[in-house]
Amino acid sequence: MGLPKGPEGQGLPEVETREDEEQNVKLTEILELLVAAGYFRARIKGLSPFDKVVGGMTWCITTCSFDVDVDLLFQENSTIGQKIALSEKIVSVLPRMKCPHQLEPHQIQGMDFIHIFPVVQWLVKRAIETKEEMGDYIRSYSISQFQKTYSLPEDDDFIKRKDKAVKTVVGLSDAYKPRRKYRRQRGAEELPDEESRVHSTLLEYGRRYGFSRQSKTEKAEDKKTALAAGLSAAEKVDAHEEDELQAAEEQRIQSLMTKMTAMANEESRLTASSVGQIVGLCSEEIKQIVSEYAGKQSELSAEESPEKLGTSQLHQRKVISLNKQILQKSKHLEELQANHTSLKAKYSDRKKTLTELKDHGEKLDKEQAALEKLEAKADPSMLQNLRALVAMNESLKSQEQEFKAHCREEMARLQQEIETLKAERAPGEKIISGGEPQGALTSTMTHNEDLDRRYNMEKEKLYKIRLLQARRNREIAILHRKIDEVPSRAELIQYQKRFIELYRQISAVHKETKQFFTLYNTLDDKKVYLEKEISLLNSIHENFSQAMASPAARDQFLRQMEQIVEGIKQSRMKMEKKKQENKMRRDQLNDQYLELLEKQRLYFKTVKEFKEEGRKNELLLSKIKAKAS
């Protein structure tokens, strides 16, 4: 692969295809590997080597459960940019797959099959391993699903015999499990060595084994050696020693057994703690248990030995037991009736509440439906104005309430001031009534009138100020509302982004719907043709026997068949013509798409050059201004 380094193309990698024999050999090996792995698209002769190799690599990567960001729709005659982009996406996935071989995008685009071959070989090996793993997993999953629904005869036999076998094994283990017959007495001295402790434990379970008793085989061997040697004296000594050992063992067993007690006696006793627990029970529970025990005992005695009792006694006991049962059942019936009445009352209350809620909900639904109808019929602008007026009315009501509260507070304050003034004036009145001159009374009345006049003036001034404040607040609220109605730049950007997202979603849904419509139309056409074919075959089948009955009918039948075949051929020609037209239209649209891509590239290039020229122009203008200054 050569890279030209001329004065104009220096630094620009120009890919060059190697057409030697080694490249062709590697290409053949790559295609054979892909076909062997299961990628049979590599056999198509109309595809270029780039499409075969890249398609095979993409197929291997997707088989290994890795994602490749490629277009699902195959495009023929891709541009160099599209090929390089596809190669870069494939190369970016290889490190995530831990591929040991390195590969560059220009090697794939330049069809350097010598470097591509090891990567394809590794991908094919990995794809085959993944297929085997998935096959094992699917096989085990299918077996498990089969076993959930169906079963083999061997499994049925095993399930039938399983419970019986388990019961037998459990019964045998319970029958032959070791049972403790003796227990060492509390306070007995501990055994010194481990051998004695083992022997004591075995004795507790009823097993008597000697400490130093030899086995029968050892005895037989000793006898054989003794006979062979002819040592009669040694036999006597051995027999005497064996008797002594046996006597010692019996003595030890007896000494150990004296320190043990039988388990039956131990189990029949009650400990102090169990007695305390029994005594700690409630007296009512003890009485109830005693009465139940007496009743059961009387019933058992009556059932076991009825011949020992008289007829009157048996009848009396039966009457007593029946009376007790009647009392118990009547108490239980009363409890159930009380519970039933309470539950019935609760049920009626809840049912009434539920009906009320349902009626209220239906009323609200009707009102909401009526309001929605009115809103649908009304003018939107008028409705908006009404909503604004309602909001303004609510705000004015709240302001009115606040103003009334403020007026009440102001009136209370002024009344308090009047009371204080009256209290200050009261001593002066007393002086006047006591014989003071009339001038003091006149001055006091003038002062009061002056205060009333000033109070009324201040009150009117306050009222005007409050009206002005309310008008200002209303204007401020209107201005705030107008300012809030104007969206900010951030909101406009957010709206724009949201509109773009909605447009993309709508276009995606539109595209998907269009595909569904196309699929539906195709399947509908297929259904129509299949129905026609079935009806034609049925008519042929029905008329075949009649047509073969006579030569004239057979000739007419053959002519009809020829006409039908000719009609099918004409329909097929029409569909082929339509297919060719669609293909030509697709090619035209593809050419237009490529032209638009070229125009887009030229547009971006022109914009970039324009920005560069603008930057140069600004730089020159700044230099000219600097020189002029």
From Swiss-Prot:
Residues 1-428 are annotated as: Sufficient for interaction with CCDC22. Keywords: Coiled coil, Endosome, Phosphoprotein, Protein transport, Transport. The keyword Protein transport applies. The modification Phosphoserine is found at residues 298, 301, 305. GO terms for cellular component: early endosome. Residues 446-629 are annotated as: Sufficient for interaction with WASHC2C. InterPro entries: CCDC93 (IPR039116), CCDC93_CC (IPR019159), CCDC93_N (IPR048747). Residues 1-23 are annotated as: Disordered. GO terms for biological process: endocytic recycling; Golgi to plasma membrane transport; protein transport. Belongs to the CCDC93 family. Component of the commander complex that is essential for endosomal recycling of transmembrane cargos; the commander complex is composed of composed of the CCC subcomplex and the retriever subcomplex. Component of the CCC complex, which is involved in the regulation of endosomal recycling of surface proteins, including integrins, signaling receptor and channels. The CCC complex associates with SNX17, retriever and WASH complexes to prevent lysosomal degradation and promote cell surface recycling of numerous cargos such as integrins ITGA5:ITGB1. This is Coiled-coil domain-containing protein 93. It comes from Mus musculus. The lineage of its organism: Eukaryota, Metazoa, Chordata, Craniata, Vertebrata.
